[in-house]
Amino acid sequence: MEEISARLNAVQEKILDLYEADKTDLPSQIEHWKLIRMECALLYTAKQMGFSHLCHQVVPSLLASKTKAFQVIELQMALETLSKSQYSTSQWTLQQTSLEVWLCEPPKCFKKQGETVTVQYDNDKKNTMDYTNWGEIYIIEEDTCTMVTGKVDYIGMYYIHNCEKVYFKYFKEDAAKYSKTQMWEVHVGGQVIVCPTSISSNQISTTETADIQTDNDNRPPQAAAKRRRPADTTDTAQPLTKLFCADPALDNRTARTATNCTNKQRTVCSSNVAPIVHLKGESNSLKCLRYRLKPYKELYSSMSSTWHWTSDNKNSKNGIVTVTFVTEQQQQMFLGTVKIPPTVQISTGFMTL
């Protein structure tokens, strides 16, 4: 017992020295997590040996030590990957490389420049939720590290990586819990992003986005959304800019010109006209694409199976999948969010249903 106690004391002393030094270089942060990893291993061994207390501290369960050790190993490996990237010489604090920040949304990414995003439900200042978006998000992939910028729109918080829009928080998830009308507005960076009441939460259309622009790195990390108390709600004198998404009800035109048509003068006057997207390509590719589109059901109204023109060559392996939308805004959101393979041809237009 004396030997394992002495080793644990030595490791914890080194950890305290790092806390007191408060260094901001990456090698120091890697060393910190190596020591935490050793601490987990010693506590795990102590529990296996039957000790309930060691160095005047309670020895955690085997499962607790094992779970934390796995998280620490993953974090240490990510830091070592980061140390091989162009961001290795940047300033990195204990807080920025903490397990809490590593695991908060978006999880398993390093993050800097946090900014609070407040979502107000039902136009009620007492019914709000606070989230943290990040000006810098460092995505670790195998042996590479990519920095992206956190963005906000009416749908939620996201970043763009490899030309793909990746949402890491959907506001509608909490709207289902806290909103009676399923409507909300987003307050961020002196702006308010709102959506017309004519568009429901499952038919959210394209909105303006707000980039995170702040140098405040000292904000405490938030691993989850924070429910704001009514007493914390105060009015500020700072002017707010409202950003509205397009409202189809405000469009008085009864006819729209169809796109990708030979006859450019043709107009569609039926009230049952729906925006569509034709996806044309090899049948097997379309089948895979249809499977990949299932998680994006909120971005379209319906999707057909793979079909063919009867006049086409019967030996052709190409097919067509038709996707319909409620509004043109929803169509544009679909095209801006979903990553379509370059082998698939995209055509937009309108169809009478």
Swiss-Prot record:
Cross-link type Glycyl lysine isopeptide (Lys-Gly) (interchain with G-Cter in SUMO), residue numbers: 280
PTM comment: the record says: Phosphorylated.
Region Transactivation domain, annotated ranges: 1-200
Q: Which residues form a coiled coil?
A: none
Q: Where is this region: DNA-binding domain?
A: 273-353
- Family designation: Belongs to the papillomaviridae E2 protein family.
Annotated region Disordered: the residues are: 206-234
One term under GO cellular component:
host cell nucleus
Protein name, per record = Regulatory protein E2
Q: Which UniProt keywords apply?
A: Activator, DNA replication, DNA-binding, Early protein, Host nucleus, Isopeptide bond, Phosphoprotein, Repressor, Transcription, Transcription regulation, Ubl conjugation
Is Zinc-finger given among the entry's keywords?
Answer: no
| MF GO annotations | DNA binding; DNA-binding transcription factor activity; nucleotide binding
- Which Pfam families does the entry link to? PPV_E2_C, PPV_E2_N
SUBUNIT field = Binds DNA as homodimer. Interacts with protein E1; this interaction greatly increases E1 DNA-binding activity. Interacts with protein L1; this interaction enhances E2-dependent replication and transcription activation. Interacts with protein L2; this interaction inhibits E2 transcriptional activity but not DNA replication function E2. Interacts with protein E7; this interaction inhibits E7 oncogenic activity. Interacts with host TAF1; this interaction modulates E2-dependent transcriptional regulation. Interacts with host BRD4; this interaction mediates E2 transcriptional activation function.
Q: What does this protein do?
A: Plays a role in the initiation of viral DNA replication. A dimer of E2 interacts with a dimer of E1 in order to improve specificity of E1 DNA binding activity. Once the complex recognizes and binds DNA at specific sites, the E2 dimer is removed from DNA. E2 also regulates viral transcription through binding to the E2RE response element (5'-ACCNNNNNNGGT-3') present in multiple copies in the regulatory regions of the viral genome. Activates or represses transcription depending on E2RE's position with regards to proximal promoter elements including the TATA-box.
- Species in which this protein is naturally found: Human papillomavirus 33
GO biological process terms, alphabetically, are:
DNA replication; DNA-templated transcription; regulation of DNA replication; viral DNA genome replication
Tell where it localizes.
Host nucleus
Q: Which domain of life is it from?
A: Viruses
Q: Where is the composition biased (Polar residues)?
A: 206-215
Q: Which InterPro entries match?
A: E2/EBNA1_C_sf, Nucleotide-bd_a/b_plait_sf, Papillomavirus_E2_C, PPV_E2_N, Reg_prot_E2, Regulatory_protein_E2_N, Regulatory_protein_E2_N_1, Regulatory_protein_E2_N_2
